[in-house]
């Protein structure tokens, strides 16, 4: 196990004049992302005064964007919190170990680089051609928790975004038999660590646009040679198709994650159906025989709806 080096504290970078060379379109996108991150932090009480936030930075577009937004928000936040960027070098072949330290130095953020050869462990345990992501993720999580403890971090920030949350929802629904997504905030099983996902309201498309304009030094995520899980790939393709063909559908599903009605599902651990009697009042009201009130379909969706209606009518 490689011993940890001290946290590096670079000289703060001068205030960037970069915004002046960006288009108004980009500045609106930047503001949109920062507003989304700020709203998620407020909605789920992710960061408080005096917190030390360890931001896990892999070298991908999502974690770069997360770090950028948190640094920007810290400048005007009503609470004071510390940010430490952390990268885990898992000794994957071809990993450019010099990229992230140079980037962290250039923006003046505290950082910690941790080196652990999990790549060799994974390759030894997983047969060739099989997806290594699950074992790799477990090993990485254990190291992240350990480093957070050593740094005294009170929050661990991950770069998962809204699309990741929705993909996880449908993966569990279609292949796991559960209505379960990816929470914006959680506590580790041992109760020691609080994990937050400040990009919970941000879309992958917006993040990708932001990262391209910022010209982050992206490190490829496939250095290990592992392929994306086939099931997740199916879900991603499905959601991308819905986004193209049914405007508003993805937004509606995302909204639904925060509007769960346990009394109208079938999980007895969430709602006490067994002791439900005539005298029991349910907060959601008596709508057992009511049709759900739905918003009117958008103009883009109406032709499809009409075709389906005509088809059903013709088939009677």
UniProtKB/Swiss-Prot annotation:
The EC class name is transferase
Concerning Gene3D superfamilies, the annotation shows: HUPs
Its family?
A: Belongs to the TtcA family.
Q: Where in the cell is it found?
A: Cytoplasm
Name a GO CC annotation attached to this entry.
cytoplasm
| Pathway(s) it belongs to | tRNA modification
Q: Which GO terms describe its biological process?
A: tRNA thio-modification
Q: Which gene encodes it?
A: ttcA
Question: Per the annotation, which location comes first and is thus the protein's main one?
Answer: cytoplasm
Q: Which reaction does it catalyse?
A: cytidine(32) in tRNA + S-sulfanyl-L-cysteinyl-[cysteine desulfurase] + AH2 + ATP = 2-thiocytidine(32) in tRNA + L-cysteinyl-[cysteine desulfurase] + A + AMP + diphosphate + H(+)
What organism does this protein naturally occur in? Aromatoleum aromaticum (strain DSM 19018 / LMG 30748 / EbN1) (Azoarcus sp. (strain EbN1))
- As annotated in the record, motif PP-loop motif runs over 58-63
Q: How many cofactor units bind, and how?
A: Binds 1 [4Fe-4S] cluster per subunit. The cluster is chelated by three Cys residues, the fourth Fe has a free coordination site that may bind a sulfur atom transferred from the persulfide of IscS.
Cell membrane as a keyword of this entry, yes or no, is: no
Q: Which cofactor does it need?
A: Mg(2+); [4Fe-4S] cluster
Molecular function via GO: 4 iron, 4 sulfur cluster binding; ATP binding; magnesium ion binding; sulfurtransferase activity; tRNA binding
| UniProt name for this protein | tRNA-cytidine(32) 2-sulfurtransferase
Residue sites binding [4Fe-4S] cluster per the record: 133, 136, 224
**Could you tell me the EC number(s) of this protein?**
2.8.1.-
Keywords linked to the UniProt accession: 4Fe-4S, ATP-binding, Cytoplasm, Iron, Iron-sulfur, Magnesium, Metal-binding, Nucleotide-binding, RNA-binding, Transferase, tRNA processing, tRNA-binding
Subunit organization: Homodimer.
């Amino acid at each position: 196990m490689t011993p940890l080096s001290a946290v590096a504290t670079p000289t703060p970078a001068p205030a960037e004049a970069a915004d002046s060379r960006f288009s108004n379109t980009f500045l609106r996108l930047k503001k949109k992302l920062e507003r989304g991150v700020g709203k998620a932090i407020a909605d789920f009480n992710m960061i408080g005064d005096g917190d030390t936030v360890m931001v896990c930075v892999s070298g991908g577009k999502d974690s770069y964007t997360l770090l950028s937004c948190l640094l920007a928000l810290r400048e005007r936040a009503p609470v004071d919190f510390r940010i430490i960027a952390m990268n885990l070098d898992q000794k994957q072949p071809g990993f450019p170990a010099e990229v992230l330290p140079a980037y962290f130095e250039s923006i003046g953020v505290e950082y910690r680089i941790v080196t652990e050869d999990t790549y060799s462990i994974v390759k030894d345990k997983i047969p060739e051609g099989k997806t290594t992501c699950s074992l790799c993720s477990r090993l990485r999580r254990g190291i992240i928790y350990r480093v957070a403890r050593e740094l005294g971090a009170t929050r661990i920030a991950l770069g998962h975004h809204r699309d990741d949350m929705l993909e996880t929802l449908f993966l569990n629904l279609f292949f796991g038999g559960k209505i379960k997504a990816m929470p914006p905030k959680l506590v580790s099983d041992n109760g020691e660590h609080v994990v937050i996902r400040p990009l919970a309201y941000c879309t992958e498309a917006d993040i990708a646009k932001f990262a391209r304009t910022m010209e982050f030094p992206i490190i490829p995520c496939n250095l290990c040679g592992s392929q994306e899980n086939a099931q997740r790939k199916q879900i991603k393709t499905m959601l991308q198709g819905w986004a193209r063909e049914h405007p508003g559908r993805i937004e509606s599903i995302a909204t639904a994650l925060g509007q769960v009605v346990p009394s109208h599902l079938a999980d007895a651990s969430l709602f006490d159906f067994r002791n439900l009697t005539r005298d029991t009042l349910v907060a959601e009201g008596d709508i057992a025989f009511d049709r759900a009130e739905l918003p009117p379909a958008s103009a883009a969706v109406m032709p499809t709806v009409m075709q389906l209606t005509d088809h059903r009518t013709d088939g009677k």
